[in-house]
Amino acid sequence: ALKRPIHLALSYDEEVGCLGTQSLINLIKQEIPEPLGVIVGEPTEMRIVTAHKGITHFLTSVYGYEAHSSQQHRGVPAIMYAGRIINWLAERQSKNAEFEDKKSGFEPGYTTLHCGLIKGGTAANICARECTFETDIRTVPGENPEDYLEELQDYIKNTLEPQMKSI
């Protein structure tokens, strides 16, 4: 016989917010003794790990000035500038990959930056007034996501904003 019971708890919707977890945690707190340990099978493919990458999720909104696409020089196309920010994310990730720590236990062994959702524009022939996109940064231990945000803000402030304001 076991001295303490073993409980199996399953949740759902890991990819878009772990919507089932909060109510599950609340129920566990109310109904059973605090667990001595937990096994989480995702995203480790059931391998034992001692650390997990950090996650920073943020929303970026770019505001431009609407113009007809045949008169782009009179507008500030928000989607095009958002694309340059997204390209910065990709270039920064490539830079990280050059210094991958293959012994880190992470796959990949470097911090990743990713844009997973983008919205903007009203028509194909209009320079968009607004573009919004969502990004996540998965940092390896020892790296601070704030450092990436500061680099990105510096790029926006010193490179993109002057170009956008010159029109």
Outline where the language-model segments fall.
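Acidic/histidine-rich catalytic neighborhood of metal-dependent amide-processing enzymes
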Residues: A1-H57
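Metal-dependent amide/peptide-bond hydrolase catalytic core
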Residues: L59-I167
